């Protein structure tokens, strides 16, 4: 029986980078006889233009029925002035929450070929390999009440709520510990327990879960210190587990240690490892349509999909090796280009990865 993959290119550079990722996926499908069947739909701004909402009900049902979802990126200035509740990003939040995709895996890996692209000294970032495990469906992005009210003095006041339940914390903590077990058996839980009640509960529950993982060395760090340590000495980290807001910020920060957010994939998983896979970067409307976007994060998201949702390790490894071989050849999109390397566009980079994968 074929496995169903739903392709959601999205907005901005999304369709361009997705075209290249799909080429790689289709070759892997053929080369390794994976039995994937691909279907396409719209999300975000493209869905607003077509359906009037950022995520149509029929698209959500397709996503539920699929074995995995591959997403490009959503959003753009065209939709920035519409009502907040129907902006493109709301489609992304809705699909995550409706599919129960509570666990976000965001690796920050520095490819040795790109050491000179990092803003930090090579000796600080060489060999960097961090996995950030971010809680994705709770916290301040989903908390209620939220809104804007008018105070007695006529001034407007905006407010949000940052709630976390024990079960929400426990399940993401388990993902963090499980990830640590297959990596370096080291886990850093990041919170703000000196100020926030939600973080105090977070730390308490993480300590409880730690009792089931005696082999894992657990540490705690306040988020402000973690942000500083990621720049000062990033290689002290192996796996980081944190909440939705902190994970959003820290994973973007960690991405720049690697030279370009255009290199970094992500996975969002439910309790059964069914997932949605997408690049860490946004829709980059400023370069959309120019054919210069880096498709490697989306291509590497395909690799994560094969690894985490389907346990197809050989095919996942082959895609990652193909990307590494292309970098060995000095082929670069503009965001990771340096003197003496070959600058190419989106399609050429995708073609290079396809050629490398075909020859493996």
UniProtKB/Swiss-Prot annotation:
Binds 1 Mg(2+) or Mn(2+) ion per subunit. One of its GO terms (cellular component) is cytosol. It comes from the Bacteria. The keyword Oxidoreductase applies. Substrate binds at residues 96, 106, 134, 224. Its EC number is 1.1.1.85. NAD(+) binds at residues 76-89, 282-294. SUPFAM superfamilies: Isocitrate/Isopropylmalate dehydrogenase-like. The record marks 141, 192 as: Important for catalysis. Pathway: Amino-acid biosynthesis; L-leucine biosynthesis; L-leucine from 3-methyl-2-oxobutanoate: step 3/4. It catalyses: (2R,3S)-3-isopropylmalate + NAD(+) = 4-methyl-2-oxopentanoate + CO2 + NADH. Homodimer. Belongs to the isocitrate and isopropylmalate dehydrogenases family. LeuB type 1 subfamily. This is 3-isopropylmalate dehydrogenase. It comes from Pseudomonas syringae pv. syringae (strain B728a). The gene is leuB.
